[in-house]
């Protein structure tokens, strides 16, 4: 009996001023009731007799006299067990209002009871500062937490902390002691129930007590033990007592050092949560290449902020940007401040916010900005292998070219409008991005302009931004790589310190396919600049030398040609044309006479050409040069130099010009030398002059009408084009080299078929023309002084060689025309 009594007493002696913890912690658990029990209670409450008995029981319990009898009986029973029981009845004091974990509202009743010990104080020294003061010991008692409703019938929590009435009286007289009582009560609630109270936003409503006062019990061991406890234990003196280890040594207790409590913040950070919102898009569940590119990125962000002490959003300020949310409330008793960084860039213009007055919760819905989603056409694009800057041209109609040029100009204007200088130099480069310097860049100078070429491909025009200063420029842009991952570049350029007078007036930045062109317009000439400074920013600069310096071309003075007079005389009786050229010196006249004699002999030899060569018709067209056209209208009497007899059949005219030593102007008309051994293009004006000019009668090409006396009136400057448009169609699944090989095989097969169809006589003519062609090509490798009309401008006295040369050229001309026609048919 004695052992069980001792264990029972020890069970209730763990604390002097503590109540039953198990009862407190289990108070919030829900009632476990079965369905049958609920049905029986419902049926019983439906009976009038049961309700009458139930109300009588409630009145009996609430009767103070009956409660006094109940407390006396409980005290007597506990005293028999050796435990003193004291019932504490809280007396109203004041109320503190706050919140639990930033979610639920709660009230703390600071009450008084004479059963609680009085507060005690003693003189003490602060170990940190050395100041003398009073150290208070304030006893207290706590009751179990209970649920209640506030003025708006919303659920809340209520806690009771009971002090001695003298402590409450001191709190009314001294504000510091009152604050000490409040801090002690808050610490007790947080320690006992393991919750976090909002100490920043404390309110003091005009209430003495929240709810109905409920008594609590304090249990402690009785000072007068019972008779059973006074009896000695039978085994107590059977064995000697064991001496203690520290017996005889003084006990040294460590000095208690009170840690300074951190200052309470002025604002409380409310509890919040960020939720990702996704829409059900059926296109993301397909097998397309671009179906799941944006699956991991949400459509919107939903931010929920718990504000239990606010009644509406009019009491707070909310600022939302593309990357953050800032909330501030300066209302007394509800001071909140929250600065939240968002994980994604949002559209703050399209967001919406709503405050739930029932739950005291602020809901913010912000749509997420998604980058440009690459479509299936861009993902499936493959490299065609053709360079962007190819010299090959394809025949396109003029209307399509005009439309393309207009679209290109509009795109350039849009790019120029998008590239605007940024007006925030300190934060120009974003700290969250990694920038790198272009691997290769060049600088060229021209008058007062510095042009930089940054060799970076696939630059997005809308990403170009720059900051312009007087003597420096900071540029940044982004390039899209093969994996659709942007690479950011930065380029900082500054003028050298030697050229202190130079200032940047204007800046132009333009993105191309393979590079970025940066143009700086200076206030003075840039010829004296020898180097420049470049790097990622102004802290990382290196000196680079300038290798490319150019000067603007000055207009060359126009040299007036000496006018040469040409006089034409036509004989109607005999088809002949007499040409007289004046303004030549004696040497040039002698050279011209010798050349005309050789040309006359050559014309006589051409009359004996074969009928096959006469029957063929050349489609080429020739016209007089510009210098000859200018000098044709003038006529001065002079001695005739040569007279040429012309046949009445079709004629061909050539302009033979002696090349001068210095020519400063070149015409726009180009010619192809088909009689020379090497392929070259030159201007007709290179050989044109006002002094030597002659007209040769030869076989016509069939396209130019015979010139009469109208030559002396005016000479038209015309350029003729073929009406037939050649076009080539390329298949998407084949390469250009493969089509070229296929066309070459087709031409070879056609050539072999033509050779098989040739007769014996035609084969002989073909072999003879081929031999003449080979012989002429060998001859041209040694002599390169022939004009495109076939005339030899040098003075050769060998008449036989001139005649053979003319035959070879005529035969070669018609063979080349046949080859050109065959190639045209193959292309078509």
Swiss-Prot record:
- Bias (Basic residues) ranges: 9-22, 606-620, 741-755
Where are the residues of the annotated region Disordered? 1-31, 223-250, 383-424, 556-668, 741-828
Quote the subcellular location field of this record: Cytoplasm
- Output the Gene Ontology terms for molecular function: protein phosphatase 1 binding
User: InterPro entries from the entry?
Assistant: Kintoun, PIH1/Kintoun_subfamily, PIH1_N, PIH1D1/2/3_CS-like
Q: Does the keyword Cytoplasm apply?
A: yes
Classify the source by domain of life: Eukaryota
Which UniProt keywords are present, listed alphabetically? Cytoplasm, Phosphoprotein
Q: Which Pfam families does the UniProt record give?
A: PIH1, PIH1_CS
Q: Supply one GO BP term.
A: axonemal dynein complex assembly
The name this protein goes by in its record: Protein kintoun
Q: Which organism is it from?
A: Drosophila willistoni
Underlying gene: Nop17l
